[in-house]
Amino acid sequence: MSEESWQELVDLDRLRAWMDGRGLGDGQLDGATPLSGGTQNVLLRFVRNGRAYVLRRSPRSPRGDGNETNRREARVLSALATTDVPHPRLIAHETSPDILGAAFYLMEPIDGFNATVGLPDLHAGDAAVRRRMAFALVDGALALGRVDYNAAGLAGFGKVEGFLQRQVPRWRALLDSYRAYDEWPGPGSIPALDEVADWLNRNQPAGMTPGLMHGDYHLANVMYRNDSPELAAIVDWELTTIGDPLLDMGWIIATWPDPDGSTTSEIGVKPWTGFPTIEELMAYYASQSQRDTSQLRWYGVLGCYKLGLILEGTYARSCAGKASVTTGERLHNSCIKLFERAQRWMT
């Protein structure tokens, strides 16, 4: 994000006055710097009285209700404060759009790195460290699934009833909505679409134990400690809900690179040597989880199905000239790879 674009969305004078009213330091907001990330949300780091902050607010034209999404994120971060889930610490939040034009919150900066962007020397130079990084990712999903969401104040945060039954029709409806985009070739360009959907419906687990789930859990949405292979924080909480936490492991199954480092969804790390296979991670998850993991493959197939249909949306928009053609074709290719992976897990 350019300096000009973030300045249009974050009025530092109004933010400073708001912080004054909250007792969050005094004086100027120094060193305001936009941070890159995996979303279109505004992330702005600044310092006041020697304390660093990161502000997060929705973009100018968010998909859906950006204010409600931001409020939900802040609620989750607040609820996680007393848990062992690694997360950015919430400092304060504003639910009204009156201050900056959108709801926003302030959190502590994370001392860590995104492995999909690059590895520091400690991690790049030691295959054993990289191996542990993978299990740390799974540990994060396990910790999140163990949270007592009622005790944490998140009762009613998601629609538990019929959660699994809604998945296939919900994401198929999203795919069908892409017909509104001119020149999109339609569902027929996705291999085995109906076959995967039918398999998911036939093999759907009989029940689930509801829990807190991230909703987009993969290597690019965590940050690692600079001094160890452990997680520093899980980030990008905008899809978090109460549902079936096994789907977070299913998301790992869908996005985990193959042994040669090739990926279904452009989420990878270099060097890839040292990282365990997805089968090893599934076995580890099953050994550490108190949930019924006998149908973990089903969640992996669902992860492929869901992510593939979400990515196809960018391709559909690109066909109508509403997104980059290059990006659209790249993500359509990822969709195809995800459905090919789903077919392999179905056998």
Annotate each predicted stretch with a short phrase:
Residues M1-G25:
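Juxta-kinase regulatory segment immediately upstream of eukaryotic protein kinase catalytic domains
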Residues A32-V196, N203-L212, N226:
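ATP-binding pocket architecture of kinase catalytic cores
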Residues G158-K159, D292-G303:
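All-alpha amphipathic helical-bundle segments outside canonical DNA-binding/catalytic cores
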Residues L212-H214, L219:
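Catalytic-loop of the protein kinase fold
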Residues V235-T240:
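Activation of the activation-loop gatekeeper triad in protein kinase-fold domains
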Residues L247-S289, G303-A320:
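Active-site activation/catalytic loop segments of kinase-like enzymes and analogous catalytic loops
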Residues R291, Q295, L309-T347:
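Helical subdomain adjoining the active site within ATP-dependent kinase catalytic cores
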